[in-house]
Amino acid sequence: MQGSLKLKLLTSLGVALTALTCSGFAQEEPFTAGTWTRITNTPPFNASEPLLLTDGTVIVQEYGTSNWYKLTPDINGIYLNGTWSPIAPFPSNYGPLYYGTAVLADGRAIAEGGEYNFLQSSFTNLGAIYDPKANTWTAITPPPNGSGAGDVSSVVFPWGNWMVADVFNGASAITNPSTCPPCTWTSIAGNGKADRNDEEGWNLLPDGSILTTDAIDAPNSERYIATMQKWVSAGSTIVRLEDPNSQEIGPATLRPNGTVFATGACVESNSTCTEPGHTSVYTISSGSWTPGPDFPNGLDIADGPASILPDGNVLVCTSPGLFVNGIQMFEYDGSSLHPTGNIANAASEPSYVVRFLALPSGGILETDGSTVVEIYKPSGTYNSAWQPKITSFPQSVTRGQTYKISGTQFNGVSEGATYGDDAQMRTNYPLVRVTNNSTHHVKYWKTHNHSTMGVQTGAAIVSTNFDVPSGAETGASQLVVVANGIPSNPVAITVQ
């Protein structure tokens, strides 16, 4: 925020059938690993904020407007060849940019705040909730006492409640989504918070606490303990991850090994780095930080996305200094940063315009406020210990009915894609993917009422419900539960 709003408005920007294998590998996108490929059907709008619904479709906001569109994967479960269709818009007075979002345990999506509204500086506290079944966005009551206004961080706790930040101080507000709309909010004092929430991102940890790296009280980091309604120090990141002038900071990503890879903006002068952009690694078990590799060549992440990949690597989007064009993508493998292929608009964009979304196919969807939407296909694969495991399921299902499925690791080993205060695209919830044995057609069946919204749930038995579409293909089929591109081994079902 920095006294006056940072001006980060986007300027003008110059099929193979993959069958489900018996081992349950991901429904992979049909192009070369390690590369970005533009989706076949160009969207009829400038694509901005993406969210993954629990029926496998991706909804995307049109940049700076109230309009939304839906990307539906093709009949083989491939997003590269998916088709676009309009869905209901936000309420007519709400067209946010840089705001808080979440997909909830009941399958609805929710949005709050906005640093801009219809591309005008506003620090709006408006919000809305989306019901996919009714195809409606409905206005919600703003959080009290300034929470929810502007570019807010937000998080869904394992028990399903949604918390949004007050960017002006360390306070926040929380709601039980069952009260939405209109939403009943409870104010949470910023007890123990060392600085205000502005510019900081929140990462959900396996114990249900929140980790943040401070943008003002750097190099301090903090954890929010929900049971105590209190912030406590998580120690020094050792290297600075914020630009002290703009207070911008990079995204952080939970990895399967119980660490959080946090990235930084460099210290800049006249938008140029005067020292390298740093990274640091938080080990949850010890509560300690270790400096990671620096970004090379004057690159950093002064706002921008990152995403976990199925193999545990982290994809990050960098650019030079503060809001300077020239994107370079990297994969972090736990020790080093490795350059990868770049998106089509890399030369004409800074990192902050980009959004990532972890797809159930294992690919990473990218939007940048233009009609160029691309998917990154990682080259690595996952450790079998990270797979969801199905322990209880219906062997026979009837079209039009709802069923419960149980197992372990349904919510994945990470939150998925991250950004920070300006955008949240988490996908730590289970999807159900079904392949018909005769036609090999692939469909996602809507899940809802997940028993947890946690991460790295380990050996705990968790569950979700799934709806069998009335038009589902009948006969013998294979079902997998998938989270962040990692599927379970398939189980056999019969659709009647």
Region roles according to the model:
Residues Q2-L13:
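Bacterial N-terminal signal peptides that target proteins for export
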Residues T11-T21:
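Bacterial N-terminal signal peptides
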Residues G24-E28:
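Boundary at the C-terminal end of the N-terminal hydrophobic targeting segment
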Residues G34, N135, C180-C183, Q229, ...:
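Short coil/turn linkers that define WD40 beta-propeller blade boundaries
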Residues R38-S48, I59-V60, N67-I78, T83-F90, ...:
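Immunoglobulin-like IPT/TIG beta-sandwich domains and homologous Ig-like subdomains
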Residues I39-T42, E49-T65, K70-P73, I87-F90, ...:
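Glycine-centered tight turns/hairpins at beta-strand boundaries that repeat
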Residues W137, W289-P291, N383-S392:
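Proline-enriched interdomain boundary motifs that mark the N-terminal boundary
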